Amino acid sequence: MEIKQVFEQNSELIDQEIELIARVRSNRQGKFVSFMILNDGTTFTDLQVVYKTKTKGYEQALQARVSSIVKVIGRVVLTPEKQQKFEVQADAIELIDQAIEDYPLQKKEHTTEYLREIAHLRAKTKTFNAIFKIRSAAAYAIHKFFNDRGFVYIHSPIITSNDAEGAGEAFLVTTREDADYEKDFFAKKASLTVSGQLHAEAFAQAFKKVYTFGPTFRAENSNTAKHAAEFWMIEPEVAFADLKDNIQLIQDMVKYIINYIFKHNRRELEFCNEHLEDGLIDKLNSVRNSEFKVTTYTEAIEILKQAVANGHKFEVSDIEFGLDLGTEHERYICEQVNKAPTFVTNYPKEIKAFYMKQNEDNKTVAAVDLLVPGIGELVGGSQREDNYEKLIKRCKEVNIDIDQLEWYNNLRLYGYYKSAGFGLGFERLIMYITGASNIRDVIPFPRTPKNLLF
């Protein structure tokens, strides 16, 4: 029997004999009774097993070290006077596999820095068990959200010849030691994808509502708490949709995911609130229960200018139209001014991607970023440029290889009305939901500069 089943069926199992196999989290010998705390990975909550000298295998059980595997046969009994509602009184304990004495994860607290060095073991700790349970649940919630709304899930390619962001920070894919791409596997320069958006946009023209959810890669030599070389992106795309539709979809999705975690992972959330970020649950409640605000980029610039005039200190205090807002500016807007998650719209075209729809003022594009208290930008999206001539002109302005993107640009020639979508960095979302302060702690095996240990 799994420990999760014991907790789910505890009232039906009272005084019933059960058998389970689990891992030892702690083992303490007492004068008259001894206590073993077990978990088999099926639930966040540990199960207490009580055993005595008359328990079959008693001497063997006493020797069970942390992380050893045991088989327990015993009865479920109520313990209303204790912290837990019930426990298992063991009739027999078998030590199936003994962990080594210097097992790296002992009962003492370990730093996250140390645990990153043993990423193959850290999921056994309470902290990372909670984080990765929430990550799993959030991934399921994303698929459920889009599936319930009629979206088609597509698998965009991992290997591509396109750089959707135009930043040139892609990992090259090659079978050669030289740079002769014509003789390479694909007979051209290839790289790992930085975004599935362009391919999603093509499929949206066939299915109307699509989304990708998969790994993306950036060869950005940045050793910060927010950057990783490999991460996951959620990228929906909706044909015949504009920026207003996009904003509504973002708000609905973010609230849905948080609500799902509250419903299905409350225990893990409470642990994160206690151990990772004090006030986490209040923060998430404010997001899921509030109406998101909308502010234009131009309005945001004026707000920031006024803040500087009133004496507020920003690290970057030269606030002018064209500034690429930093985290400090984003957090000021949503935390100090709007006091709510905030959509900032209509950014200058010079600081946004080539494929975004140009507004009538010829200065801004129909872009949107969702800013949330605590971290700043969480989601970035836009309505896409639907005018072929404008798109080609913009590609030339920013030195995008038109021939390389011919297939994408030509979508506008085959019946193209509107399209809008966004990208949400999955790890950044998990950081926000769990209170984890470093992206390395929300990815099972993080890939960062100078780090490829596993």
From Swiss-Prot:
Q: Does this entry carry the keyword Transmembrane?
A: no
Provide the reaction this enzyme catalyses.
tRNA(Asn) + L-asparagine + ATP = L-asparaginyl-tRNA(Asn) + AMP + diphosphate + H(+)
Q: Do you know which CDD domains this protein is assigned to?
A: AsxRS_core, EcAsnRS_like_N
Compartments annotated for it: namely: Cytoplasm
Q: Which InterPro entries match?
A: Aa-tRNA-synt_II, aa-tRNA-synth_II, aa-tRNA-synth_II/BPL/LPL, Asn-tRNA-ligase, Asp/Asn-tRNA-synth_IIb, NA-bd_OB-fold, NA-bd_OB_tRNA
Q: Name one Pfam family in it.
A: tRNA-synt_2
Entry keyword set: Aminoacyl-tRNA synthetase, ATP-binding, Cytoplasm, Ligase, Nucleotide-binding, Protein biosynthesis
Biological processes, Gene Ontology terms: asparaginyl-tRNA aminoacylation
Q: Name one GO molecular function term.
A: asparagine-tRNA ligase activity
Q: Name one GO cellular component term.
A: cytoplasm
EC number(s) reported in the record: 6.1.1.22
Family in the record: Belongs to the class-II aminoacyl-tRNA synthetase family.
Q: How does it assemble?
A: Homodimer.
UniProt-listed HAMAP family: Asn_tRNA_synth
Name of the protein this chain belongs to: Asparagine--tRNA ligase
Q: Which organism is it from?
A: Mycoplasma capricolum subsp. capricolum (strain California kid / ATCC 27343 / NCTC 10154)
Q: Which gene encodes it?
A: asnS
